[in-house]
């Protein structure tokens, strides 16, 4: 093991420093990485115990956001970090996705990668640095990790691509994507865009890959100093005699018949029955003790799945036929409905084959904005999308708990896709919440969410610029051929080589996500996949526009009503009143809710009755208006003194009508008026101290 080492290099205007052997020395692998003023610590460890009975790599990636990294104390009653925030979960997924395919297929030991954010500057988000740190930590460790990866964030500002754009540059960028990959190819993409073209997207990915190569060269330079002995993983196989008998019993034509059943559940059932039939026959012929039988059974099941996978891929490549009978470029049948729920503010049902999303839109008042408080961001969020994937959508039985990482990730992608067409606050002051309930799933449910969400937004009368549609693309590759699949279903996602999701409008791409199970994809394949995805997106958009072509002109009668008014920020105190007295009285009298921006003076009034909302607005206008000489009021007498009447013109505004200004009533005013009477007065003077002098207005 090497002692403490440090490496530094300039990249993209920032200094990148890696330290090894100083901290977390008991971890199998640890990398301290500083990029700019952002610092992350990645640690990688593996259990010595093999987990029995699992058919996947048990990898866990944790991303810890420490508030001290940004010089902040966590909000709330308990002043310490709790469960991972949504942003931390998304960052963990961002790191997980490019590294997961690089573990041996048969690794069955628990692997835990923890990326801890220790310091952060606003211009160098630590999530992408975490990909670089994770790759180093895994390569420093004894864990059998088979590759070197790195990632970059790329923007598109004023016609120029920018690697690791600053926070200010991202505000004006048409593009915000994270790209990860190896030296040879791109393996992961995640991000959003403002209707960029396919050509611009490919160009961005190629620029990003050139930057990734530079980072990987630095990694290679570091790792050349290491000669770590890696843990050996033995590839488990069924016994030779069992494999031989399995090959004899398996009839390819029988397997083919079952693979080409169009309906997902029936296909799954028939494949399961055939698998169990074969394995049962084998165990009838061979004596195997109970302890070994469980392992051999699992290995035979894996062997069957591998045979089915190879046959499905062979049929697609050689015959151009997919499991449900479609051609590679064919989309599943689509139906769209809007207004399916009578009491919601907007709703839509989008069905594509055996994938179905129910989209629901709820409109809320400005005070219902989501508060955002992370180490990278503070503020509020007006456009929110939540994605729910209940177990019944795939015919399973599972406990209902909170959203998992997958649900959070899918919802975030769909939100980014739709956010590009969402109206500005000035045009539509509502908080908008979109919920996607996945009622049925056979692949591409996140893209179905984009479609149902777009339809529901128009149904709700939200003035989105245009429809957004999404489609998931797949890839099947062998030594000589590559076939891009349009609108993949679950089986093709599971057994294919790529999951490539593209969402956008007729004008361009608004969200993009790609994950590869192979070494990666090159420029020509990206061009082909994006071109094919655009053709599919146009078809889907045509169907959506046939269903509802523009946002409804009026909101649902059950939606809240909002009216805005801007007042002088100096008048905010008067509107609130001492102890909130004035604003509370308005809320109670007109049955509304009010939010005030004390910096801009913007006042939002929210209620269910249009008349009451309008009345409240008029009342606020009157209350906060500048009083000028000549203005007339019907005011209430609050006090009577020998020298005149004190009259409340509006809450908090009182003037004095001197006895000499009361006309014919100047001598007998104390007998004629009493406290609480309403009198019509006119403003005759306002002195330098702001005191208002009144006179009796002529009847």
Swiss-Prot record:
Mg(2+) binds at residues 493, 499. One of its GO terms (cellular component) is cytosol. Keywords: Cytoplasm, Magnesium, Metal-binding, Nucleotidyltransferase, RNA-binding, Transferase. Its cofactor is Mg(2+). It catalyses: RNA(n+1) + phosphate = RNA(n) + a ribonucleoside 5'-diphosphate. It comes from the Bacteria. Residues 630-697 form the S1 motif domain. InterPro entries: ExoRNase_PH_dom1, ExoRNase_PH_dom2, ExoRNase_PH_dom2_sf, KH_dom, KH_dom_type_1, KH_dom_type_1_sf, NA-bd_OB-fold, PNPase. One of its GO terms (biological process) is RNA processing. Its EC number is 2.7.7.8. Residues 560-620 form the KH domain. It is an enzyme of class 2 (transferase). GO terms for molecular function: 3'-5'-RNA exonuclease activity; magnesium ion binding; polyribonucleotide nucleotidyltransferase activity; RNA binding. The keyword Metal-binding applies. SUPFAM superfamilies: Eukaryotic type KH-domain (KH-domain type I) (SSF54791), Nucleic acid-binding proteins (SSF50249), Ribonuclease PH domain 2-like (SSF55666), Ribosomal protein S5 domain 2-like (SSF54211). It is found in: Cytoplasm. NCBIfam families: polynuc_phos, PRK11824.1. Belongs to the polyribonucleotide nucleotidyltransferase family. Involved in mRNA degradation. Catalyzes the phosphorolysis of single-stranded polyribonucleotides processively in the 3'- to 5'-direction. This is Polyribonucleotide nucleotidyltransferase. It comes from Thermosipho melanesiensis (strain DSM 12029 / CIP 104789 / BI429). The gene is pnp.
């Amino acid at each position: 093991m090497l002692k403490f080492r440090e490496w530094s290099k300039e990249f993209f205007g920032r200094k990148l420093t890696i330290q090894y052997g100083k901290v977390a020395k008991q971890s199998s692998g640890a990398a301290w990485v500083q990029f700019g003023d952002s610092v992350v610590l990645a640690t990688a460890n593996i259990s010595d115990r093999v987990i029995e009975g699992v058919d996947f790599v048990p990898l866990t990636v944790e991303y810890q956001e420490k508030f001290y990294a940004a010089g902040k104390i966590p909000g709330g009653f308990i002043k310490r970090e709790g469960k991972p925030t949504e942003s931390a979960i998304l960052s963990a997924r961002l790191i997980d996705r490019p590294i997961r395919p690089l573990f041996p297929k048969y690794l069955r030991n628990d692997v835990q990668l923890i990326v801890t954010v220790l310091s952060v500057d606003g211009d160098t988000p630590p999530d992408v640095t975490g990909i670089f740190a994770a790759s180093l930590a895994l390569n420093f460790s004894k864990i059998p990790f088979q590759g070197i990866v790195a990632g970059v964030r790329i923007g598109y500002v004023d016609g120029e691509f920018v690697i690791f754009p600053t926070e200010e540059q991202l505000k004006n960028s048409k593009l915000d994507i994270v790209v990860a990959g190896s030296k040879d190819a791109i393996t992961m993409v995640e991000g959003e865009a403002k209707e960029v073209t396919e050509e611009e997207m490919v160009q961005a990915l190629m620029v990003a890959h050139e930057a990734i190569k530079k980072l990987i060269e630095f990694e290679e330079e570091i790792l050349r100093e290491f000669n770590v002995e890696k843990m050996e993983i033995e590839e488990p196989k069924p016994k030779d005699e069992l494999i031989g008998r399995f090959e004899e019993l398996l009839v390819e034509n029988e397997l083919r018949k079952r693979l080409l059943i169009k309906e997902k559940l029936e296909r799954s059932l028939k494949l399961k029955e055939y698998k169990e039939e074969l394995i049962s026959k084998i165990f009838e012929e061979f004596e195997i003790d109970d302890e070994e039988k469980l392992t051999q059974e699992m290995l035979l099941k894996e062997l069957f799945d591998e045979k089915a996978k190879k046959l499905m891929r062979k049929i697609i490549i050689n015959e151009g036929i997919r499991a449900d009978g479609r051609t590679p470029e064919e989309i599943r049948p689509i139906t769209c409905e809007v207004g399916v729920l009578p009491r919601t503010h907007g709703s839509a049902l989008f069905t594509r084959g055996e994938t179905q999303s129910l989209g629901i839109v709820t409109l809320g008042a400005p005070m219902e904005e989501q508060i955002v408080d992370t180490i990278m961001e503070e503020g509020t969020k007006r456009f929110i999308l939540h994605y729910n994937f209940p177990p019944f959508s795939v015919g399973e039985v599972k406990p209902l708990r909170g959203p998992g990482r997958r649900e959070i990730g899918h919802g975030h992608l769909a939100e980014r896709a739709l956010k590009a067409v969402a109206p500005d606050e000035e045009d539509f002051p509502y908080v908008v919440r979109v919920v996607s309930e996945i009622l049925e799933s056979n692949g591409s449910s996140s893209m179905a969410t984009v479609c149902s969400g777009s339809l529901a937004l128009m149904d709700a009368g939200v003035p989105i610029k245009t429809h957004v549609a999404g489609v998931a693309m797949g890839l099947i590759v062998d030594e000589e051929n590559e076939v891009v699949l349009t609108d993949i279903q679950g089986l093709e996602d599971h057994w294919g080589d790529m999951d490539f999701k593209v969402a956008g409008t007729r004008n361009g791409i608004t969200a993009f996500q790609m994950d590869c199970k192979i070494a990666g994809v090159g420029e020509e394949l990206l061009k082909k996949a994006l071109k094919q995805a655009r053709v599919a997106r146009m078809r889907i958009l045509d169907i959506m526009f046939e269903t509802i072509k523009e946002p409804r002109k009026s909101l649902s009668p059950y939606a809240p009503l909002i009216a805005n008014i801007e007042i002088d920020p100096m008048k905010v105190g008067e509107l609130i009143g001492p102890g909130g007295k004035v604003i509370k009285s308005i809320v109670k009298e007109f049955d509304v809710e009010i939010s005030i921006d004390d910096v801009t003076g913007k006042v939002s009034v929210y209620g269910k009755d249009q008349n009451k909302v309008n009345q409240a607005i008029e009342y606020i206008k009157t209350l906060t208006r500048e009083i000028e000489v000549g203005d007339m009021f019907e005011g209430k007498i609050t006090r009577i003194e020998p020298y005149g009447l004190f009259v409340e013109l509006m809450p908090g505004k009182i003037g004095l009508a001197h006895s000499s200004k009361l006309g014919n009533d100047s001598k007998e005013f104390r007998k004629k008026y009493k406290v609480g009477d309403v009198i019509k007065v006119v403003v005759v003077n306002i002195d330098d101290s702001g005191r208002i002098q009144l006179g009796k207005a002529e009847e």
